[in-house]
Amino acid sequence: MKKNSVISQEEKKGSAAFQVFGFTNKIRRLSAHLELHKKDYSSQRGLRKILGKRQRLLAYFSKKNRVRYKELINQLNIREIKR
């Protein structure tokens, strides 16, 4: 997935949308790695940490800009956070 298709020019590298996009890419890569290496516990821990970071960032983003949050989760094909 290309960053330019999800992130607009106004949103810089530090924006919440950009960070969520980066975490989502890392999560997908680690998930694919863990399908091959089921006993890689260090990577499992790293995946859980990244999932937590993304969840906190999505919670912040949903409070800040609900419309853009909905667009982002639809573009990235991820579920909404639980409330």
Curated annotation (Swiss-Prot):
GO molecular-function term, one example from the UniProt record: structural constituent of ribosome
Similarity comment: family membership: Belongs to the universal ribosomal protein uS15 family.
Protein's UniProt name: Small ribosomal subunit protein uS15c
HAMAP family named among the record's database cross-references: Ribosomal_uS15_B
UniProt-annotated location(s): Plastid, Chloroplast
Keyword Glycoprotein in annotation: no
GO cellular component, one term: ribosome
CDD domains: Ribosomal_S15p_S13e (cd00353)
GO BP term (any one): translation
Primary location class: plastid
Keywords from the named record: Chloroplast, Plastid, Ribonucleoprotein, Ribosomal protein
Subunit structure, interactors included: Part of the 30S ribosomal subunit.
SMART domains listed in its UniProt record: Ribosomal_S15 (SM01387)
PROSITE patterns: RIBOSOMAL_S15 (PS00362)
